Each structure stands twice: as C-alpha cells, then as structure tokens.
Amino acid sequence: MKEYKILLVDDHEIIINGIMNALLPWPHFKIVEHVKNGLEVYNACCAYEPDILILDLSLPGINGLDIIPQLHQRWPAMNILVYTAYQQEYMTIKTLAAGANGYVLKSSSQQVLLAALQTVAVNKRYIDPTLNREAILAELNADTTNHQLLTLRERQVLKLIDEGYTNHGISEKLHISIKTVETHRMNMMRKLQVHKVTELLNCARRMRLIEY
C-alpha cells in the first residue's frame, strides 16, 4: 500500500496527539512532522514535501485560509485537508475555493477524519458529512461562475472602490491611468447591469465578488 507523508499544522497539543493516535493503526498515513504556526509551514513543506497537509484555520502568526492559495500554487500536487472548529458553510466555501481538497470539523469522529484522508489522498474532494454538501457545492460553483464575470484587474479595482479609494487613489495604487480606472468601473457596471457605485458594491457583495 502506498505511503502518504502527512504534515500536521495545529497549535493545540491535544489535537496533535489525538490525530497521531488515531492514525497509529494506519501506518500508510505517516505524520512526518507537525508545526504549530503558519509561519513554519513553508519550511516544513520544503523539508518534507508532504503528500497531505492537515491544516487548522486558526493559527498564530498567519490565518490558515490566507496561506492555502500560496501553498496550492507552490506545491500543486500536495493535497490540503482543513481540520477546523468553524462550522459555518461560508467558511467551507471560502476554504475549498482557495484550493483546499477537504474540510473536516474537529467535532467529528476519528472515522470521519480517516475517511477524509483516504478521499483527499486520491485527489478527491471531501466535505464533512454534518455539513450540507449539495448546498456548499452549488454555492462554490456559483462563486466560480461569478468570479469569471470580472477580470482580475477589475476585481482589484472593485476591492479598492469598496475600501473607499477615489479614481486617483486607485490609479496610484495599481499604477494605471485614471482613464483606465474609469474604463474598468464602467465595464463592471455594464457586466453587473447597474448604474451607480452603491449598486455596484451591493451587487458585488451579494455575488461574493469582494474578498475580505
């Protein structure tokens, strides 16, 4: 049976010990290292090149959600299983959209964690069975479609508009001309079929086009 190297990222000793004990009967899941904050993840990934990363979202030093896209880009073959206390479905959606392969609640049984590991190990997606999988996948697909409406640059401009930047401020921030900023603004309004900035922002929030 193929051996899978696992890097465990969690700052709670009881969680670390619990996972290690749960995997003792399954030697093909080998925990090669565990670290306790987000800042240590990169060095550990470079050193051990894990097949699976078990990641908590609440970490000292850096938010687990923030590092998922970077890890996914740097190590695309590494599967990321988020192991968290957050039960909100919107967090599941954001986590999977960021590039995680699985989402498991810490309140779930060891059998659920094992099932999740077995699933993500073969490059499939796993969602904790206590969550509404169909609703999450529907929202995830809708988010993907919505994001494709706007270009990356348009989303950057949109975020700065939401933060209160003027056209001049956006042009300086993104190193583009004011004319280009105005063009992006008009294109976004046309795509979302709105006529005012307030309508643009309200529509963008409803469609989850603005990241926080």
From Swiss-Prot:
Keyword hit for Transcription: yes
One Pfam family named in its UniProt record: Response_reg
Highest taxon above the source species: Bacteria
Effect of D56A: Strongly decreases DNA-binding activity; leads to abnormal regulation of virulence gene expression. Does not affect biofilm formation
Biological process per Gene Ontology, one example term: positive regulation of DNA-templated transcription
Effect of deleting the gene: Decreases expression of genes encoding virulence proteins. Down-regulated targets are involved in transport, secretion, and trafficking of cellular components in addition to protein and membrane modification. Increases expression of invasion protein invF following invasion of macrophages. Regulation of gene expression is abnormal in conditions of acidic pH, during phosphate starvation and in low magnesium. Decreases survival in macrophages. Decreases level of biofilm formation and abolishes expression of csgD; simultaneous knockout of hns suppresses the effect.
Effect caused by changing H28A: Does not affect its activation by acidic pH
Outcome of substituting H12Y: Decreases DNA-binding in neutral pH, but activation of activity by acidic pH is normal. Decreases transcriptional activator activity and survival in host cells
Modified residues (S-nitrosocysteine): C203
Effect of substituting C203D: Abolishes DNA-binding
Coiled coil: none
PTM section of the record: SsrB phosphorylated on Asp-56 activates the expression of virulence genes whereas the unphosphorylated form controls biofilm formation. Independently of SsrA, can be phosphorylated by small inorganic phosphate donors (such as acetyl phosphate or phosphoramidate).
Induction conditions: Induced about 3-fold in acidic pH compared to in neutral pH.
Effect of C46A: Increases activity
Residues the record lists as 4-aspartylphosphate modifications: D56
Variant or mutagenesis effect after changing L201A: Strongly decreases activity
Job of this protein: Member of the two-component regulatory system SsrA/SsrB (SpiR/SsrB) that is required for intracellular proliferation and systemic dissemination within the host.
Note: C-terminal tagging with photoactivatable mCherry abolishes the increase in activity seen at acidic pH, N-terminal tagging leads to slightly higher activity at acidic pH.
Name this polypeptide is given: Response regulator SsrB
The organism of origin for this protein: Salmonella typhimurium (strain LT2 / SGSC1412 / ATCC 700720)
